[in-house]
Amino acid sequence: VCSSDLAAAKAAGPSATPSAASSVLAKHRQELGTLASTLPFFAYTACFLLAPTVIVVVGAFQDRSGGFTLSNFNKMFEANTVAAFGTSILVSVASSVIGAVVGALASYALVIGAKPNGLLRRMISAISSVLAQFGGVMLAFAFIATIGINGIGTMLIKTLTGYTVNPNWLSSLPGLITIYCYFQIPLMIIIFLPAVDSIRPQWREACESLGGNTFQYWTRVACPILAPRFISAFLLLFASAFSAYATAAALFSQRSILVPLMIQGAMRNEMDPNQQGFAQVLAFAMIIVVAIVMLLSHAVEKRAGRWQ
């Protein structure tokens, strides 16, 4: 028996070697294919994300001649700069809270009121995907044409009720927050809908079988599971609103009440040559704020990942 096994092993040896070699070659080809498919993404990220970040960080510590300086940071703690950061944070927090709450309620209503693959679910998901990207000058123009000084909605309200809408409302902070909610709510639906989908009906049945009521189910089961994802989504909404520029620029063309608008004013300033460096400092500060928010979002997302 031993001699026959030895003979079989010797016979299988030469044929097994090419098979192992072919598997190694196939593995290398797969790795090369993966690298080739991801290379454009890394190139795009390096060109349009990493390189601008490096330019901003380096430029914040350079003077006009390219030497190292800290004078660009002198205006960071002036009253108008602090006010711009405070206003940006206020608008971002307010629009994010409204967008997160309304979007979460809409996601829950969509889960319990529509079939997973139904027409209503697909339509709302598609519309939310479009509206989440509908910002900038187009969004500002849409609101101006609707409820601006001579907007269709403004004229209709005046004709039907005699009430005249405040012509400066769109150029106020409540108006800006309302406009931001137009893309914050759909973005929240896209982000939070998978989290609500992950809640299993068996968990509620188990809670009820153990004598729990609806309040106990939400406070001890559903909310602890959804809270990390809700906080993570809120932080993403905050980062989105904090870095938004085009919509506010179309409404506040001559007022630097937000940090992105202050950066625009500093870049266009031709009277003070040091304003270019100050613009880099403002952008650097925005990068720090957004980076902190994204790190917090990632930490919360890791905790929520075990339930997905």
What positions do the PLM features span?
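Short, small-residue-biased leader/transition segments that mark boundaries at the very start
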Residues: V1-S3
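Transmembrane-helix boundary motif in ABC transporter permease subunits
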Residues: S95-S128, A145, H298-K302
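Interhelical loop and adjacent transmembrane-helix boundary motif
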Residues: R29-Q30, K75-N80, A249-A299, G305
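Membrane-interfacial helix termini and adjacent extracytoplasmic/periplasmic loops
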Residues: K27, L70, A140-C181, L251-R255
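Transmembrane alpha-helices
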Residues: L39-F48, M188-F192, R200-P201, G212-A244, ...
